[in-house]
């Protein structure tokens, strides 16, 4: 690869992250959509460098791969999944104009501390930082106040993927911080929700502790006290919880017979599950952006959400749904039942309203914003034809 590029030549960008497809999650999906838009619509030669396993699954993935047209290189690693070590990353960055690091982990710190050796132009996207769970929280807080601010200095810009991330990083990344909210694939699940109003809740994503699915099961138990027609479908893949763990939680809440778990659904299968539901549920303790909620709204589902910052922002933008206080589920359950009872008259209006809010989160626009940021930090323009195509989106 040529390490030196003229302004009229293809820009080479290496996206670096610890997990990518076939792993499933908000970060993985966001990066897939961004890199795909960059390659297909902006003429940016975007590649991905990641680790060679899906956390929680046995086996190794191929060292070289192509995912949806995106070249992928995977590295062996050691240590903990919370901070996986892969120092050989330095062997793979030489031919790129810009390194785009995703999330705050080993790659973020190591590439910063070795910057005097490689001297690459770098930006980083936050994706929620590393506060997705309470695990090791005290250590994380100390790290975030001491190590992270030093690492930040090696990056031209730190991109908050949500306004809650911007609040989190505003002190450690002062002067470098900008906000570019994530987008969604607007065609993936658009208008997929059931046309027949019902009391089925769909939850989808990783089976992870911070998603607080047990809390959602407790809410369903309260809802079933109002109307026995309430049930829940949980679709996703094992993470730090398994499908058996979820069944045990549902059993403890008395709703085992009202739960259906679908492991590892394809997009087509997930779209089909949306066609069985009227509601989407997520009572997560933390979300960097809330990708699944926005995707659910694009399908026309009515969201039932915890009162964390990214979800509150969706409601402020006009989403039609229910915000639940995790410390007091009863009022949220009452509101959800009232909304379900009114669906025969209100479903079409709620569907249109939620789809409209979701339509504002478009990956083509997000990719264009990142392209402008790349121009800024590199001090050079992308080819005019590419930027004109981006502006036409």
From Swiss-Prot:
Gene3D superfamilies: Glycogen Phosphorylase B. GO terms for molecular function: glycosyltransferase activity. The keyword Isomerase does not apply. GO terms for biological process: lipopolysaccharide biosynthetic process. It catalyses: beta-D-Glc-(1->4)-alpha-D-Glc-di-trans,octa-cis-undecaprenyl diphosphate + GDP-alpha-D-mannose = alpha-D-Man-(1->3)-beta-D-Glc-(1->4)-alpha-D-Glc-1-di-trans,octa-cis-undecaprenyl diphosphate + GDP + H(+). The keyword Isomerase does not apply. Belongs to the glycosyltransferase group 1 family. Glycosyltransferase 4 subfamily. PANTHER family: GLYCOSYLTRANSFERASE WBBK-RELATED. Involved in the biosynthesis of the exopolysaccharide acetan, a water-soluble polysaccharide involved in production of bacterial cellulose (BC). This is GDP-mannose:cellobiosyl-diphosphopolyprenol alpha-mannosyltransferase. It comes from Komagataeibacter xylinus. The gene is aceC.
């Amino acid at each position: 690869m040529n390490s030196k590029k003229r302004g009229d030549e293809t820009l080479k960008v290496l996206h670096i992250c610890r997990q990518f497809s076939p792993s499933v999650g908000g970060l993985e999906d966001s990066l897939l959509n961004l890199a795909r838009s960059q390659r297909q619509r902006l003429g940016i030669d975007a590649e991905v460098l990641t680790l060679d396993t899906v956390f929680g699954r046995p086996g190794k993935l191929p060292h070289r791969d192509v995912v949806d047209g995106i070249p992928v290189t995977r590295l062996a690693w050691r240590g903990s999944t919370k901070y996986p070590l892969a120092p050989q990353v330095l062997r793979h960055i030489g031919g790129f104009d810009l390194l785009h690091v995703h999330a705050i982990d080993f790659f973020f710190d190591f590439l910063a501390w070795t910057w005097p050796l490689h001297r690459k132009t770098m930006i980083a996207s936050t994706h929620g930082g590393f506060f997705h769970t309470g695990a090791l929280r005290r250590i994380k807080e100390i790290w975030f106040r001491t190590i992270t601010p030093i690492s930040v200095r090696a990056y031209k810009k730190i991109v908050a993927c949500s306004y809650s991330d911007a609040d989190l990083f505003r002190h450690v990344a002062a002067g470098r911080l900008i906000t570019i909210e994530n987008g969604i694939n607007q065609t993936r699940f658009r208008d997929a929700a059931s046309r027949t109003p019902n009391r089925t809740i769909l939850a989808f994503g990783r089976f992870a502790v911070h998603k607080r699915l047990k809390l959602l099961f407790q809410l369903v138990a309260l809802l079933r006290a109002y109307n026995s027609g309430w049930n829940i479908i949980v679709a996703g893949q094992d993470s730090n919880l398994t499908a058996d763990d979820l069944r045990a939680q549902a059993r403890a809440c008395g709703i085992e017979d009202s739960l259906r778990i679908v492991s590892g659904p394809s997009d087509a299968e997930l779209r089909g599950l949306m066609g069985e539901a009227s509601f989407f549920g997520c009572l997560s303790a933390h979300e960097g952006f809330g990708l699944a909620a926005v995707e659910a709204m694009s399908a026309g589902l009515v969201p039932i959400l915890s009162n964390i910052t990214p979800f509150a922002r969706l409601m402020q933008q006009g989403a039609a749904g229910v915000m639940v206080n995790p410390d007091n589920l009863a009022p949220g359950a009452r509101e959800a039942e009232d909304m379900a009872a009114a669906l025969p008259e209100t479903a079409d209006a709620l569907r249109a309203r939620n789809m409209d809010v979701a339509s504002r989160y478009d990956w083509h626009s997000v990719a264009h914003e990142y392209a402008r940021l790349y121009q800024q930090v590199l001090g050079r323009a992308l080819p005019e034809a590419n930027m004109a195509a981006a502006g036409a989106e």
